[in-house]
Amino acid sequence: MIKAGIIGGAGYTAGELIRLLLNHPDVEIAFINSSSNAGNKITDVHEGLYGETDLVFTDELPLDTIDVLFFCTAHGDTKKFMESHNVPEDLKIIDLSMDYRIKSDDHDFVYGLPELNRRTICQSKHVANPGCFATCIQLGLLPLAKHLLLNDDVMVNAITGSTGAGVKPGATSHFSWRNNNLSIYKPFSHQHVPEIKQSLKQLQNSFHSESISFLTEVTLPVVFLPLS
């Protein structure tokens, strides 16, 4: 069995990761770290997992007991952790934040889009998981880049739901503000643009990075429930 640990286990991303790992026949979750929820049951936070696990959040980090470590932390926290902790050399790491998605001589993380880097991922100890928008956009554009067809400007208009903003509430995350509404955020400057450009140029070196414009919007459609 592959023993896995998770740091930052209380967010939406972690909840989905926990569900996937619980249902994986070859994985055993050794610990789920969350300093703000230490001692609480996983199902107290991720109620959709009720009946699936009796695991409890911990503030401990027994890194020498696991084979793979997942980071579900806020952007910037993974890098801080790696720089301040003695991580076992043979420990495999999968980072779900944006800290290591861009290639650099300063780290050895591989961009974790299997449709693009499957072989390299299999041989790597450190994997940077792609962003959500970046994944769906690349799956649409990479086949064109592979055949060198991205020779004109690329316009992307993408819409996401409320969970994309994370579990922490904010002024624009309330139901009364989002309900049946559509709003633009980070126009033409979304943090996923650099990784999209990086992947497109990997397959089509002639692609001009300034040729892609990315407009993101958030929405929460109204749902009508019939009353009996």
Describe the predicted segments one by one.
Residues M1-P187, Q204-S206:
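N-terminal Rossmann-like NAD(P) cofactor-binding subdomain of oxidoreductases
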Residues S173-F175, N180-S228:
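Contiguous C-terminal substrate-recognition/catalytic subdomains in enzyme active sites
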